[in-house]
Each structure stands twice: as C-alpha cells, then as structure tokens.
Regions:
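Amphipathic alpha-helical scaffolding segments comprising HEAT/armadillo-like alpha-solenoid repeats
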Residues: 347-355, 378-390, 408-420, 439-452, ...
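Short inter-helical turns and helix N-cap capping residues of alpha-solenoid HEAT/ARM repeat scaffolds
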Residues: 361-362, 392-393, 422-423, 455-456
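Conserved, compact domain cores that house catalytic/ligand-binding motifs in diverse enzymes
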Residues: 359-382
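Residue-level detector of extended alpha-helical repeat arrays and alpha-solenoid scaffolds
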Residues: 365-366, 397, 427, 460, ...
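Hydrophobic core positions within HEAT/HEAT-like alpha-solenoid repeats
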Residues: 355, 370, 386, 398-401, ...
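Beta-propeller domains with acidic blade repeats across secreted/periplasmic ectodomains
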Residues: 1-353, 364, 372-375
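Ligand-binding pocket scaffold of soluble enzyme catalytic domains
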Residues: 65, 436-437
Length: 480
C-alpha cells in the first residue's frame, strides 16, 4: 500500500501464519504467502485459506512447512481502484457461500476452472458457492471496505462517511422489476447521522482534502461484532466500526426499527469512543472474534493513511507515504466479565459434536462448526439436526436449518417447523430457505399466507419478498 512494491509497483502483499503457545501468546510467525496484490481479506477453507488479493485466490500448504505451495485462482476479473474500495470483506454466510463486497468497482468476473459465462457485477456485491463454483450478485454494494453478518444473518457494510449501512433488498428481488430504484437497497441505519459525530483523542482529526470532516466519520472501514462471550451490559449485540483517520473504533448498539435495524451510539459512550488512541499511526482496519472468545483488533500502523491520489501535489513532498509499513500490530481485547475458553479442536470433532457447537455463544466456534459440517458433506445423519431444530437455541435452530440445506438434506417438514417457530429470527431464515425450493411452494402456501399477518415486521417484510418470487392467485390478497 498504496502503489505496490518498488518503482515498478509490483505486488508486495504478504500473509503471515501465526502460531500460539499454551498461554495464548504468539510464539512464531511464518511467511505463508507473498507477492500478493493488495490483500484485503482472508477466510478459512478446507485445509487452506481464500484471500481477496485482486483476484479470489485459494492458498494451501501441502508439506507442513508453513508456506503455501498451492495458489489457485478461483475468481478473476474484479476491477481495481483505490485500495480501500477493492474486493474485500470475505465472510462465510449461513447459506454456505463465501460473500464479499465489490467496493463499487464493477468488473466482469469469471472462474478460470469453470465454463460458466462471466458475470458482470455492475454495482453489486457477490457470493461464491464452493460446491458448484457458481458466483452470484447479492446486494447493491455500499462501496466501502468490509462486511459483517450478525448471528441472525443480517449483513452490514461501511462506506467512508456512512459508517454503517444495512444490506436490505437483495439484487434478485430488485431485478424482477426493470427500472426499480436501487439507491436505498443498501442504506444507512445510523440514528446519529450519515456523517456521524466521532470523538478522537488524537491531534490529527481530518483528511488533507476534506477539512470539513474534522470530528466526523470520514474513513469508516473494517467492521466487527462484539463477541457473544462479552456479556456485560450493552456490550451484548454491539457492532464495531473503525475510522482510520480518527485513530479510533466506534461502537453502536442495534435496535429493531420496523423490518430493519437502527444503529445507536452505545449509551456508555455518548461523548467518547470504544477505543481511541493518541498515536497518530494507530490505524484500525479490522476486527475478528478468535477461537478463545476474545476480540482481535488489526492495526495497520501508518503515519499517512490518505491515499496519495487525494493529497495535493504541492504538499506531497512533506509526507513519508510508507512510514509504518514495518509496524503492523494485532491487539487482543478481553471483557472483564468474559468467560475464558479453551481452544476447541473442531478439525477432529465428530459430526454430532459439530452440530452441538451450532448453538455455542462464541461466534467463531459456531461459525466454524457450520463451515466444517458443510465442507465435509456428510449426509448420513439427520437426527442431530432435527433435534436442534425442535428444541435448540435460536442460533442452533438457524444453523441446523441452513446446514441441512447446504447438505441437500432439507425436507419441507423441517422448513415448516421453522416457519412455526416462536422466534421471529428462525421464521425469517426458514422463509429464505423456502424461497430456494419452489417445488415446495404450493404445499407451504397456507402457512406462508397466514404469516402475512405475523406480529414481527421483519417476518412480514420477507413474506412480501417471497410472495414476489412465487406467483400464486392469492398473493395479492395476502399482501393486502
């Protein structure tokens, strides 16, 4: 960053593999991969990782020397722009697909291993199915850096001055109606403004080319969730957003607002931030929950974060653009009330053990168990899933339903059980699964029709979407 390596601008991005000792401290760092083009995001997959680095690339170490000796391009054709708007935000979704944000750079993407036609992203984000290799447009892109899913599958993304946008209407719903305006399909949900007030404690509070943004979000990018293991007060369910110019991490608490959510500044932080630093090189760019239940914060450490394209030429000579490139940091953030977890070796867990982890309060454990179940494609046992759907926690029900769908094991009776669940979040996800099975539509119609009067606004919103997908003579009456 920002122009590549050396005078020629050759790819100089790297990935390091860290190993930890028994106390949870880093004991070694290995150069896992190098010569990558602006790597922005990484996701685990099978016995390797998938990285967003200009292309979507699979990396794998086959001989145990901590160096990736397999490098396979899964998707290519993404347009490149200013680095914070490149392909980023890789996240595994409940649907078993790898989701990413496009950053508004468009592109015509395709898989070198597939005969499928190239896909014009236009102004949309995307998802890749590892089982079929198929890539799809998902939501109108927010145009920013980063993506998160909450535990119920809702997705959020930032874009510079708009620090939190919810992806509301999927592309497939909008494309049924030619000319349907898409501008609000991914929309700001902040109750404290599109360019919200922030409270940095550092002296540099503005971008060189935007002095009017001092004291307000100007460079939001990189998001995370408060881990489910953090149970103190309003920490529960919180969303974190980084602002690299402000040297801070902001926290919002989510509240229902009709069929979507509203992000409100945390009550304990009305005039200060969740994390703020006086270090002008503190550049938070991402947050992740670890296997131990702690929150991990990535600090890019740069003296100058503004891209040179936006710095006036007459003052460019005053800046050392690469200062801090050798000082990246990772912080571990723990809650004083947090339960301490031993790292669970899910790689050796049985199918039944993985299903039991689908209701785990640690987001990492829950999501990893889900991913491994779908990766293994073991379709021999439905009983553990059915038990989770019938009597598990909200998250175990949701994950069990989607795991069965990812394994091709879902029966209409499973979905009907979810449609009648007492929790609206389970009903919403059951509707999304039903939408993927038009062969069940006529049989499920009576239940769906009755749900048009559901007391929950988010459920009613998804009823309207699904009625638009599946024609039926009584659809209009149900909507009215």
């Amino acid at each position: 960053h920002p122009y590549g390596q050396g005078p020629s601008g050759s790819p100089g991005g790297t990935i390091s593999k860290l190993t930890f000792d028994a106390s949870g401290n880093v004991s070694a760092s290995h150069l896992y991969a190098e010569r990558l083009s602006f790597p922005t995001s990484i996701a685990p997959y099978k016995d390797g990782v998938i990285v967003a680095a200009g292309d979507l690339i699979f990396l794998r170490d086959t001989d145990g020397d901590h160096i990736a000796d397999v490098r396979q391009t899964l998707l290519t054709g993404f347009n490149q722009g200013v680095t914070d708007s490149n392909l980023s935000g890789l996240r595994w979704g409940l649907d078993g697909r790898l989701h990413g944000v496009n950053g508004g750079n468009n592109g015509i993407i395709y898989s070198p291993q597939s005969a499928a036609d190239p896909l014009a992203l236009r102004n949309a984000d995307f998802a890749w199915n590892p089982l079929t290799g198929r890539v799809s447009r998902t939501y109108h892109t927010g145009g920013g850096f980063g993506l998160i899913f909450d535990r119920f599958g809702r997705s959020f993304t930032p874009h510079n001055i708009n620090h939190i946008l919810q992806r509301i209407l999927p592309v497939k719903a909008m494309e049924r109606f030619r000319g349907f305006p898409s501008i609000k399909a991914t929309s700001s949900i902040s109750d404290h403004g599109g360019m919200a007030r922030i409270y940095p404690i550092s002296t540099a509070q503005t971008r060189v080319n935007h002095p009017e943004q001092a004291g307000y979000f100007s460079s939001s990018g990189g998001m995370g969730l408060i881990p489910g293991t953090f149970t103190h007060g309003s920490l529960v369910g919180g969303v974190l957003v980084c602002d690299v110019v402000g040297n801070l991490v902001h926290r919002d608490v989510m509240y229902p607002k009709g069929p979507i959510l509203e992000a409100r500044r945390a009550p304990e932080e009305q005039s200060h931030e969740f994390i703020a630093s006086r270090d002008l090189a503190f550049r938070p760019v991402g947050l992740e929950t670890g296997p131990d239940g702690h929150l991990y914060l990535m600090d890019m450490q740069r003296g100058v974060i503004e891209h040179p394209d936006y710095i006036p030429e007459q003052i460019m000579g005053n800046y050392r653009i690469r200062e801090g490139a050798d000082r990246g940091r990772i912080y571990r953030v723990a809650s004083v009330d947090e339960t301490s977890y031993e790292n669970t070796n899910l790689a050796s867990a049985t199918h039944e053990e993985l299903v039991a982890h689908l209701g785990h309060e640690n987001d990492w454990v829950r999501g990893t168990a889900h991913r491994l179940i779908v990766e293994r494609q073991a379709t021999t046992n439905r009983s553990s899933f059915k038990e989770a759907i019938a009597s598990g926690s909200i998250t175990s029900k949701i994950h069990a339903l989607w795991c069965m769908n990812g394994l091709g094991m879902t029966h209409i009776e499973d979905v009907q059980l979810g449609l009648n669940d007492q929790h609206p979040e389970v009903r919403v996800q059951s509707l999304k699964i039903l939408e993927k099975h038009p062969e069940w539509w006529n049989q499920a119609w009576p239940v769906v029709q009755s749900m048009a009067q559901d007391p929950d606004a988010e459920v009613r919103f998804h009823i309207a979407l699904i009625l638009g997908c599946h024609p039926h003579p009584d659809n209009e009456a149900a909507l009215i």
